[in-house]
C-alpha cells in the first residue's frame, strides 16, 4: 500500500533555487564511470523538511549519535558530527547522492556562490546501505555520517541537505532536511513566567522572555542585522522568525514583553510504543499479523479540549526508533507496521482539516497524516506506516484557508504543559553577505 504525498497548502518558505553541481568520479563493482561535466539545475525547491518519493520512510537526521539531538553542530568541530539514516521501501535500492546549500535565517537560499560556503566536492555519495532481514515489509536502510573532509561547510548558519538520485533534477529528488552550523558568540537566556502580559491568555498560553547577551560583538546596526528564531518542540509551522528586540541595551538585547513570543500551551503528547510486537504496551488495543504486514490498533481516543491537564512524561513529540529484542539490529531487522488511530468526534469539521502531528510524520502536514472522517464510526481515522519504536503524537487542526495549526479543538491548551523551546540567534555579516548562526539554546517551559 503506497501513500501519496502533498504539502499542506501554501508554503511560506517556497523559493526558487539554482544549483550548480560538479560531478566527481565514482566506482561501482570495479567499473569506473567517467566524471560528468558541470551541469546546472534550475527548479523550484522549498528550503524545508520534505519527502518527494513515496518509498522514503523513517528519515532521521541528528547530532552526536543521539537520535533526539537536533542537527546543530559547531563550526570549529564538524567532521562526522551528523548522522543521517533512512529507509526506502522495497527490495531494491537506489544509488543516492547528497549535497547541501546555505540558507538565510528565514530559510531562503543565500545569495552565495558555492565556493563561498563549502570546500571540496559539490556532492557526495551515500554508499553505506543494507537490506532488511526477516521482515514482512522489505526495505533498504541507508546511513551517512557527515560532514566529510572532502565536502565541508565553511560558514555558520542554516543549511538544507538534499538527497537525490543521478543528476539533481526535480524528478530525482528523494527528500530534503534542515541542519545548522553554529559559531557561538552570544548567550541566550530564557524565562517562562507564570502569567502572560495579556492576562486573558495566562491559563492557555506560554510567553517567553528572552535576552541575548553579546558584549563582544555589539554594533550600532544590531537591530537591523540581528534576527531571533523561536521554535516550540520540533515544530516549524508556528516558528517565529526574524524577531527584533523590544529594547537594546549596551551589552544585551531584550525580547521581553513581546506579544510575538506568546505560544499556545498545547498539551502533553500521546504515546505509542510497538518496539515489541508480542506485547501490548500502554494504550494499544491489539497487535496482529497478516500475511503481508503487522497492524497496531491504538485505543480509541477522545478529544482533550475540555479535560483537565494531566502531567506525564513524554519526549515532546519526538520518536525513538528501536526494536525491543537484543538479538535484532534495529537498522535492518526492525519491521514496519500500520498504526491505526481513531479520534471520536461528533461531526466533521467544516473549515479545518485534522492531522496527526509530531515526529511521527517528521512534523509535516500532508495526505499521509491527514485524518478522514468516518460517519459510520463517528470520528476521524488515520493509518500510518511506521518502523518499530516509540512515538509521540498529537491531534491538531489546520485551517483550510490560512494553514494555521491549532490544538484548541482537539488537544486543548494549558499554561503548565511541558514544552521545549529552541532559540536561534542570527547576525547578518555584510562582508560575507550571509546570515551567520551565532547563538543557540533550548529551554523548557516548566
Give short role names for the model-derived ranges:
Residues 51-102, 200-214, 328-341:
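Contiguous beta-strand segments within globular domains
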Residues 41-76, 183-199, 315-328:
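Short, compositionally biased P/S/T/A/G/V-rich stretches that sit at domain boundaries
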Residues 298-350, 438-444:
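Basic K/R-rich, polyanion-interacting modules in nucleoproteins and related proteins
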Amino acid at each position: 500500500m503506497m501513500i501519496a504525498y502533498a504539502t499542506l497548502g501554501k508554503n511560506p518558505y517556497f523559493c526558487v533555487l539554482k544549483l550548480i553541481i560538479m560531478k566527481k568520479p565514482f566506482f561501482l563493482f570495479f567499473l569506473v564511470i567517467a566524471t560528468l561535466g558541470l551541469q546546472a539545475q534550475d527548479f523550484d525547491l522549498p528550503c524545508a523538511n520534505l519527502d518527494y518519493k513515496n518509498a522514503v520512510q523513517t528519515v532521521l537526521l541528528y547530532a552526536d549519535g543521539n537520535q533526539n539531538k537536533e542537527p546543530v553542530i559547531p563550526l570549529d568541530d564538524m567532521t562526522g558530527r551528523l548522522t543521517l539514516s533512512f529507509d526506502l521501501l522495497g527490495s531494491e535500492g537506489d544509488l543516492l547522492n547528497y549535497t547541501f546549500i546555505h540558507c538565510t535565517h528565514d530559510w531562503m537560499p543565500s545569495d552565495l556562490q558555492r565556493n563561498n560556503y563549502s570546500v571540496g566536492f559539490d556532492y557526495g555519495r551515500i554508499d553505506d546501505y543494507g537490506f532488511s532481514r526477516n521482515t514482512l515489509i522489505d526495505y533498504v536502510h541507508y546511513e551517512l555520517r557527515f560532514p566529510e573532509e572532502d565536502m565541508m561547510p565553511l560558514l555558520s548558519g542554516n543549511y538544507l541537505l538534499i538527497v537525490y538520485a543521478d543528476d539533481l533534477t526535480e524528478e530525482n529528488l528523494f527528500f530534503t532536511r534542515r541542519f545548522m552550523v553554529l559559531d557561538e558568540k552570544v548567550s541566550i537566556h530564557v524565562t517562562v513566567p507564570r502569567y502572560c502580559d495579556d492576562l486573558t491568555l495566562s491559563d492557555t498560553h506560554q510567553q517567553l522572555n528572552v535576552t541575548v547577551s553579546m558584549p563582544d560583538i555589539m554594533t550600532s546596526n544590531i537591530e537591523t542585522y540581528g534576527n531571533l528564531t523561536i521554535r516550540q518542540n520540533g515544530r516549524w509551522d508556528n516558528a517565529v522568525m526574524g524577531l527584533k528586540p523590544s529594547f537594546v541595551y549596551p551589552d544585551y538585547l531584550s525580547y521581553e514583553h513581546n506579544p510575538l513570543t506568546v505560544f499556545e500551551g498545547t498539551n502533553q503528547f500521546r504515546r505509542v510504543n510497538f518496539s515489541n510486537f508480542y506485547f501490548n504496551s500502554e494504550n494499544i488495543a491489539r497487535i496482529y499479523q497478516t500475511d503481508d504486514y503487522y497492524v497496531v490498533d491504538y485505543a480509541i481516543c477522545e478529544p482533550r479540549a475540555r479535560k483537565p491537564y494531566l502531567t506525564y512524561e513524554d519526549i515532546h513529540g519526538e520518536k525513538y526508533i528501536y526494536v525491543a529484542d537484543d538479538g535484532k539490529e534495529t537498522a535492518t531487522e526492525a519491521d514496519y507496521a500500520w498504526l491505526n488511530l481513531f479520534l471520536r468526534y461528533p461531526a466533521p469539521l467544516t473549515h479545518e482539516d485534522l492531522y496527526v502531528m509530531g515526529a511521527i510524520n517528521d512534523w509535516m502536514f500532508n495526505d499521509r497524516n491527514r485524518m478522514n472522517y468516518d460517519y459510520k464510526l463517528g470520528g476521524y481515522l488515520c493509518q500510518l506506516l511506521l518502523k518499530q519504536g516509540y512515538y509521540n503524537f498529537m491531534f491538531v487542526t489546520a485551517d483550510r484557508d490560512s494553514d494555521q495549526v491549532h490544538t484548541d479543538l482537539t488537544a486543548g491548551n494549558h499554561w503548565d504543559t511541558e514544552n521545549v523551546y529552541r532559540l536561534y540567534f542570527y547576525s547578518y555579516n555584510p562582508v560575507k553577505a550571509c546570515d551567520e548562526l551565532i547563538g543557540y539554546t533550548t529551554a523548557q517551559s516548566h
